[in-house]
Amino acid sequence: VQILENQFRGLLLKVNDNELWVKLIGDFNAYNLTAIYGAAELLGLKSEETLRLMSALDNVNGRFEYFISDTNITTIVDYAHTPDALKNVLETINSIRTKNETLITVVGCGGDRDKSKRPKMAHIASALSTKVIFTSDNPRSENPDQIISEMEVGVESQNFKKTMSITDRKQAIK
């Protein structure tokens, strides 16, 4: 499988001698599709049927869902909850976006969960985004401002100027 195009609306792949358009985005989805195609081949399924089914695949809700507004602003929703997942999402966006497009990341960490990933998530977001907004994300029994403070520790000094904190998630998304 070869990636011919990778854009916010999907992937154009070359699979053997066929071109395949899917509504999925990013190298990681191309790898997943390669695994699907290979497994189908091993199971003896017809290539044409496998390609037809693959072309109908859609994102899982909350995983790299993209929306394009009437004013051509692309919004991507991904509930990445680990540092590696966030890094993959932001690297995928950066590989697709043009240099004049701004990447604004809104990120939060859940309460009563692994505290060690909070500074890592903030470090990754601030290193790979044009602007970052730290916000509350289901704080459970914890103080949301304390969670955000623990995230901010991970921001390197040269990236701090492009970050801000808005505790209210709805306001942060606006």
Briefly describe each language-model feature range.
Residues 122-174:
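C-terminal helical cap/extension that packs against the catalytic core
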Residues 1-4, 173-174:
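Short, solvent-exposed polar/charged micro-motifs at secondary-structure junctions
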Residues 8, 16-131, 153:
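Nucleotide phosphate-binding/pyrophosphate-handling subdomain across enzymes
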Residues 1-2, 18, 163-164:
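Structural signal for short hydrophobic segments within the conserved structured cores
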Residues 4-12:
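A short, compositionally biased
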